[in-house]
Amino acid sequence: RKRPPQRDAEADGVIEGRNAVIEALRAGTAIDKIYLAKGDTDSALGHIANTARANGVVVVNADRRKLDEMSRTHAHQGVIAVAAVRAYASIEDIFQRAEERGEAPLIVLCDELSDPHNLGAVIRTAECAGAHGVVIPKRRSAGLTAIVAKTSAGAVSHIPVARVPNLTALMKELQKRGVWIFGAEMNGNTSLYEADLKGPAAIVIGSEGSGMSRLVAETCDFTVSIPMKGKINSLNASAAAAILLYEAVRQRLS
């Protein structure tokens, strides 16, 4: 079987091999995830895992077949890192942006959006609508990879994207800071056109397959339903985000 043509590893943020990954960690490169060969007990891989975790990087144990599929050089030595295209922002960066604009915070929370195209499209929508930031969880989510950046049409460079260990814990923190949380849900308890999005608001967008996770949905102040008039009963993540965000824009302009 012919090998696929090697792609430009630098262009899509893939860093392969033990020395290259260790050097990237030492240099403080913004790394999205590190994939390690499952079951490999080599001390060098253990050192990489410990260093990564100490720096807050997500470490994923993957079988060698997955690493072989990801590899561009076919010499990954049991470790592949995927670099983030830019450093993650903090929650404070998002609040600061709202303060600088003299606006009530408008934040998008992405619950387990694992498809990078969906995440990129949501980030693009959020930036266009003037949201102050996007938040993703560290696990079970796409990160700021090259695919996400490309799908966002460059929006990742213009809006803060923060990454948190626990989305539910962050939601509770936002609530303490006076932010109302609205989750998009097919059978929501509030109609889109009855939701008051003029004040400090966070909009939660769940995954296309299963929507919001149970704990996230339970932590929302309101679950918001979008009127559906056709035979298809769901929208993709970026379309749902666009509808809620632009309803917030409409309310804030009027």
Region locations from a protein language model:
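N-terminal positively charged helical leader segments and presequences
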Residues: 1-97
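Conserved RecA-like P-loop NTPase ATPase core
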Residues: 17, 118, 126, 181, ...
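Structured adenosyl-cofactor binding patch, chiefly the S-adenosyl-L-methionine
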Residues: 22, 128, 146-155, 214-254
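RNA substrate-binding interface of SAM-dependent RNA methyltransferases
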Residues: 26-30, 36, 46, 57, ...
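Short beta->alpha connector loops at strand-helix junctions that form conserved
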Residues: 63, 84, 111, 137-138, ...
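A short acidic, often aromatic-flanked loop/helix-cap motif at beta-alpha or helix-coil junctions
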Residues: 65-70, 87-89, 167-171, 190, ...
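Short basic, glycine-rich beta-strand/loop surfaces that mediate nucleic-acid
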Residues: 70-84, 155, 160, 198-206
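Active-site/ligand-binding-proximal alpha/beta "capping" segment
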Residues: 182-236
